[in-house]
Curated annotation (Swiss-Prot):
Top-level taxonomy: Bacteria, Pseudomonadati, Pseudomonadota, Gammaproteobacteria, Enterobacterales
Family listed: Belongs to the NAD-dependent DNA ligase family. LigA subfamily.
GO molecular function, one term: DNA binding
Keyword Metal-binding: yes
Stated name of the protein: DNA ligase
Amino acid sequence: MEPIEQQLTELRTTLRHHEYLYHVMDAPEVPDAEYDRLMRKLRELESQHPELITPDSPTQRVGAAPLTAFSQIRHEVPMLSLDNVFDEESFLAFNKRVQDRLKSTDHLTYCCELKLDGLAVSILYENGVLVQAATRGDGTTGEDITSNVRTIRAIPLKLHGENIPARLEVRGEVFLPQAGFEKINEEARRTGGKVFANPRNAAAGSLRQLDPRITAKRPLTFFCYGVGVLEGGELPASHSARLLQFKAWGLPVSDRVTLCHTPEEVLTYYRKVEEERPHLGFDIDGVVIKVDSLALQEQLGFVARAPRWAVAFKFPAQEQMTFVRDVEFQVGRTGAITPVARLEPVHVAGVLVSNATLHNADEIERLGLKIGDKVVIRRAGDVIPQVVNVVLSERPADARDVVFPTHCPVCQSDVERVEGEAVARCTGGLICGAQRKESLKHFVSRRALDVDGMGDKIIDQLVEKEYVHTPADLFRLTAGKLTGLDRMGPKSAQNVVNALEKAKETTFARFLYALGIREVGEATAAGLAAHFGTLEALEQASIEELQKVPDVGIVVATHTFNFFAEESNRDVIAQLLAEGVRWPAPVVVKAEEIDSPFAGKTVVLTGSLSQLSRDDAKARLVALGAKVAGSVSKKTDLVIAGEAAGSKLAKAQELGIEVIDEAEMMRLLGE
């Protein structure tokens, strides 16, 4: 066999292997970017040697074989995939090809949409009633998932409105919002079930359940983006108008569909969506650009596996492959031991990544990770990079097991893991330098006592020099002692002392949050402060009484009760009060008695806020008598929508729930 033939054979074999893992096993081994790279390489070689193209080459078809666990459905109109572009130059080349083929571009308009990262499906309606649903499969034959699709609430079982075709096959994407993905994995970790690497895998695994009752428990949703079969009816002559028609018939359509009349407008749309991507609430991996006119689409036609009139403009990969060089263990403020993978540095989503969290011992076991392994790293938005998969087929012979410590790597105290918890913890408490540092950093942080100018490096030095052991020791510092720290002159030292004095005047809620009670965030601290009013009342509260606070369950109540039952914690609180930490006398008012537009209401925040942090907004709302929930339901009274609000806003509008923007929230807060 000639070298070029050998190379082509190996590439095709590798691609088929990855297609099988992706489409059939729902367990991809490499990120999409690596698959795309291999496919581009194969196409390039085949274009140079067209005589060596085989009918079964991955470039000549859409995907892999369908699952055999479901009955098979042959698509009347093939479900083709799209060609990809990865940079502006490639998109402009696509635009030029379109213009050259059309000759006249006077009426050329692009319809731009989100490229959803889920599972492509076709749904057939006969006389407006859902009768069949199928996966894409290999583009020609898919799997019958009708029973499962019927459980997805976003998908109407019957269309409504006028002029519905006798047979209409719509196409779209089933996907899992980020909140639903986190909920599924949280439950899986609690029960010992399967933990999914990403929302796409979770959506695929949920949709391909043989038992529809399991699918029904998964919060899947759907956006419609196209049509296959059309009989006994008519549709508008443009893609964008068709989407509006689908929406009128009750099919969910993304609200981020935009018409662009120039290539420059398309690039602006791409950049805007990329900026909003972390706040959407669901995963996308690019934008889809389609010629809007159906007549022009027909004129442009198709190539072997994709239309000439559309392209997927993909974002920089959020997943990349690299090697694990070592695993180290960090100690948090509550003693949690967190394994961290030290990586061969790699660029992911535009950022150089050299570390990734491994969460806990269970996660290492689930991944089957060893030191030396080739792994897939994922970084989405501001999320800490994490290892999502191990490329087992490329494990080196000298790979070493990860050994979880039995003693704290900082203070050598015993490490214990409470039954039922995933996290192992150092038992050293404040004798552990790492816990002491992290507790003090939390205490002075902006959302706690907000000590201006006291950064992490100052805290590190204060602990290492043994100037500070408890939070109360901070208020005993003098400018003279602080000048003994690195890069701390007399003026800077006095500024820190002044900031500490200013920080003594705080609020009860901030003080509670600063104490660092396990599971007590800002909103919970605000709820506890509002409910009990005084420190004395909170210290004396039973677990049962604590659970009467909105959103405080048995876990938070137990941690709070145990914190105040610990004599050393009460001593630290007494010392803080003795040093002059104080807050205004409480005015305890029941929620129904609070004169506030938020009192007694269940409120949901969505999107990004520009004037307050999410936690600050929650705390303010709770203080005014609101209950802040994490998801929209029929019990929700009000949704506050910031920039790039996603699926929560859409659901609120669907349910007819009142929606206000950030400016209106600030006005109602009295700002």
